Amino acid sequence: VEFINDEVPFGFHIRNIHYHGSNAMVLLAVLHMYYQYFSGRYKIRNEVLWMTGVILGVVTILEAFTGYDVIFSERAELAISIAASLTTSIPVVGPTIRDAALGSGFSDFVLRFYAQHVFLLPIVMLGLMAVHFPRFLVFDVPMVMAIGGAILITGGVFPIDLGFKFEPTVPPGVTVPEWYLTGIYAFMRTQYDKFVTGLLWPLLFIIALVLIPFLDRYKKFSWRDRPMVTAFGITSLAQIMVTTYWGFYISPDVSIPLVERLVIDPIFFYGTMLLLVPLGFGFTYMMIKLANEAERKSK
């Protein structure tokens, strides 16, 4: 990667495009999902499209994750260590999954992650995309060109540093994973069971999203006419933003050991997460009340 970045003509631009494109891919997938969620599009007999979209979003994050890990920077090493500990924490089959995904040595790891990043996961994504939006792959060419152009410009204007190379003999510096993984990282830093915080909570959230079309029994599509569904969406968005921020936060007190600087107070953390539930529902009620009042006055 360093050779491509420093020696290949325009290699730095190619890498910048690749990096910004991967971040845009994850961000746009999340925004698209919540747009469909709040607009109730999944109610138009689109349950299969919604479920494939949720799965496609998860695979998109995995694709981005495997991509930035093959750089072998300090940030990549942290992400690889988290992945190894999470897969190992799975009861019974954990070690087997870890060995299958990460291999048993450096060369084996490189081969497996490159295969996942450039072959296995893209094939899965293409299959899901063919089911999820076959028509839009043809008719949304202008939008594809616009987003592609924006990424090309962004890659030229905002260069991305490779970061510090991971050295096994040198203690790593203070770093965090990419932004789309810092939420899970925040849960793990509460020092509760890794399987529960790093795998079970995200899995329950994904299952809840998959089941939304079958649980939403409201007849109308507007967010104002689906208060419980809207409240769940707003609360989940608030919790995602809070956990993402917390994943980036590291205590500025350099006088204490690094491990202690990374610890997040579980009582404060989970207390905040629980507090966001009534706040999310209260905010939803206020929004619906104001929207209905504005509609009444307009008539």
Q: Which residues does each predicted region cover?
A:
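Membrane-embedded and interfacial regions of multi-pass energy-transducing membrane proteins
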Residues: 1-19, 24, 29-299
